[in-house]
């Protein structure tokens, strides 16, 4: 989960067994470390017959998944966070609540302003009552509706004209840091 962060959404409370979060985005907050977080509820039943790859780990009970990850990823592939990246993430984590509160508030204000002042532009933001995702977002998100909103202006050409007319946002593809971004998804996601 890149967009909601653990501050806004706690999937374990909604029945998820394992949660994957990118800590390179909002948790870090400065785009200066690449990392992720795996959270295991410990509730999944790792039956060794159904999941033969876990046969050696079922003895660890609720820690079976973590034990396998530690053995497979850490030992065999070296997937260990560098100490400096852990430090940089911890600095960002200290201000996550405040940053998400402000960014969610700004996103809602901007989405509302666009929706109220530009009826020809379609705004997608789960915090808007007009959003088809609003009711789901109210149930699943706490402390805000996220800092990402999308708009539809009608065509790729109009989108680039709109983006190029902006003066404050950067045209970058890394979300979740200290910069306000305006990007078009097609060229960004297909490069």
Which residues fall in each region the model found?
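Conserved PLP-enzyme active-site core in the AAT-like
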Residues: 1-118
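Conserved C-terminal alpha-helix-loop-beta "cap" of PLP-dependent enzymes
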Residues: 100, 119-191
């Amino acid at each position: 989960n890149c967009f909601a962060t653990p501050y806004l959404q706690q999937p374990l409370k909604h029945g998820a067994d394992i949660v994957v979060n990118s800590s390179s985005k909002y948790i870090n907050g400065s785009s200066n470390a690449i990392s992720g977080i795996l959270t295991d509820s410990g509730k999944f039943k790792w039956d060794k017959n159904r999941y033969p790859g876990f046969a050696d780990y079922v003895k660890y009970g609720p820690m079976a998944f973590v034990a396998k990850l530690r053995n497979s990823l850490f030992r065999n592939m070296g997937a260990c966070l560098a100490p400096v990246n852990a430090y940089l993430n911890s600095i960002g984590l200290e201000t996550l609540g405040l940053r998400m509160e402000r960014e969610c508030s700004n996103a809602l204000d901007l989405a509302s302003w666009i929706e109220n002042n530009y009826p020809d532009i379609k705004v997608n933001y789960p915090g808007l009552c007009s959003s088809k995702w609003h009711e789901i977002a109210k149930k699943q998100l706490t402390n805000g509706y996220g800092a990402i909103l999308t708009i539809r202006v009608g065509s790729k050409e109009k989108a680039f004209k709109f983006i190029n007319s902006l003066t404050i946002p950067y045209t970058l593809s890394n979300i979740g840091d200290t910069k306000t971004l305006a990007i078009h998804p097609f060229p960004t996601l297909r490069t």
